[in-house]
Amino acid sequence: MNKLRLFRSFFAFLLPFGMATGAAHGALTVEIVGGAAQQIPIAVVPFAQQGVIPGQQDTIANVIGADLRRSGLFRVLETRGVANQPSDISQVNYQDWAAIQAQALTIGNIETLPGNRLKVSFRLLDVYKQSQLVGMEYNITPSQLRLTAHKIADVIYQKLTGEQGVFATRIAYVSKSGGRYALQVADSDGYNPQTVVSSAEPIISPVWSPDGTKLAYVSFEKKKPIIYVQSLVSGQRTVLANFKGNNSAPAWSPDGKRLAIVLTHAANSQIYSINADGTGLQQLTRTTAIDTEPTWSPDGRYIYFTSDRGGSPQIYRMPSSGGEASRMTFEGSYVVSPRLSPDGKSLAYIRRDGGQFRVALQDLQTGQVQVLSDGPKDESPSFAPNGRMLLHATRVGGRGALAAVSADGRVKQRLSESGGDVREPAWGPIISQ
């Protein structure tokens, strides 16, 4: 296969959507399969309310429970059979919760405040030790109730697992419905989708800035691939790269100052870096091969990328300033779409096995590889910012859908949008708030 055909085959796999039509872009729905070998049994009591909060009666408890459940690490217990439903620690009868085998208990209340504000308070309790693990209060607007529930779930997750939660993060993805493409940003559970930009032409390769305030992406609206950077705060959009030929595959450096990009303006597909304001273009690879899909290591020292310089697509690593590249993958004849785990210890990618494209995870110290997803047409892996889960695109019933799989392969989720295709996922960073 010549290099032009190979380059086209990369993007024939990564680019096209199905021709499905449907309604306007909507929220994603989550289906969960599997769980960790040892799940923590936890009870989340519906929060008591002081004052009238229309339409929000069970939002907090339901969202917290759903978040913990979809992590695969918790077994969320049914609470309706327990007669005493406490909202304050003085009301807790620990024997009631020990009887349903709860190890942890979450209680709380929502209070209306002047000026259309709410005070949300919660406590996480250790049922066995009959003590409080953590308690917090939030002063919010009604529109922040779901986000607050995600934050509470993050606190619970971190307290009980020792790892940072990611429920309050956001995801970006591209949907297609009714012949239009839309770059969407939604909560990590698929709720509250917001359109960043829409077009009659394809949009691909969204990637978050490290501070979570911007998205870089590729749009074909000018009948050629151009890289844009768009602020999620102001909505302002700027052109990052519009050189002769193709401009594709943006990837932010960990400090947010530069992006690695792929250009064909000189000849074949090569990797460059560029300042975030579009200045300071620097060529990093100079080969006769196809070099594409760059991604930075978390420490900023290296760039991993896909290249066919060995005869078939494989993953290579080079210094972030350019220089000699080392091959990183040796299992499989077709390996693309590298992504580094947040701790830099694992490399995720798409590997073709027997005509099936699946997400695989490679330990960079031992070289051990584990196939995580089921295929047959998985693509675009993206790590959660705590490294526990990977989001990726797949095909279900002829439509594009998003899926997530835990880094150990035990927990699998599917996120689908009724009436349209979704793909090109990118999991946003944890933002301090």
Swiss-Prot record:
Q: Which domain of life is it from?
A: Bacteria
| Location(s) in or outside the cell | Periplasm
* Record's GO cellular component terms: periplasmic space
Write down the InterPro entries for this protein, in alphabetical order. 6-blade_b-propeller_TolB-like, PD40, Tol-Pal_TolB, TolB_N
Keyword Signal in record: yes
Keyword terms of this UniProt record: Cell cycle, Cell division, Periplasm, Signal
The alphabetized list of GO BP terms reads: cell division; protein import
Q: What is its main location?
A: periplasm
Q: Where is the signal peptide?
A: 1-26
Q: What does this protein do?
A: Part of the Tol-Pal system, which plays a role in outer membrane invagination during cell division and is important for maintaining outer membrane integrity.
Q: Which family does it belong to?
A: Belongs to the TolB family.
The protein's matches in HAMAP family, at most eight in alphabetical order, are given as: TolB
Q: List the NCBIfam families.
A: propeller_TolB
The protein's name is Tol-Pal system protein TolB
Question: What species is given as this protein's source?
Answer: Methylobacillus flagellatus (strain ATCC 51484 / DSM 6875 / VKM B-1610 / KT)
